[in-house]
Amino acid sequence: MKFIRETKDGAVILLYVQPKAKKNEIEGVDEWRGRLKVKIKAPPVEGKANKEVVRFFSKMLGTEVEIIRGGTSREKDLLVKGFSSKEVLKKLGL
């Protein structure tokens, strides 16, 4: 899958984030962007949406995650520490 890759530190998920949504959810894969589309309730103000993305994926995956690129963009790269891409896909149900 184009939206996930492996590094020495873990798996990196390529995200496209839509802030100010009705609920936090994974909407699916944006084939054109090659990213996983995620809806987040928090607004893109003062890092609130970024914190919500980290909290959402940490809870879903049960491990520490970190935004490594795209802090001020809708396109973000999220590092899932210590997990392979296969493990991440399984936990996300993809």
UniProtKB/Swiss-Prot annotation:
Pfam families registered for this protein in UniProt: DUF167
Stated name of the protein: UPF0235 protein TON_0641
Q: Name one GO cellular component term.
A: cytoplasm
**Which PANTHER family did the record assign?**
UPF0235 PROTEIN C15ORF40 (PTHR13420:SF7)
Coiled coil (UniProt feature) = none
Q: Which family does the entry's similarity section mention?
A: Belongs to the UPF0235 family.
Task: Note the InterPro entries from the entry.
Answer: DUF167 (IPR003746), YggU-like_sf (IPR036591)
Q: Which SMART domains match?
A: DUF167 (SM01152)
**Top-level division of the source organism's lineage:** Archaea
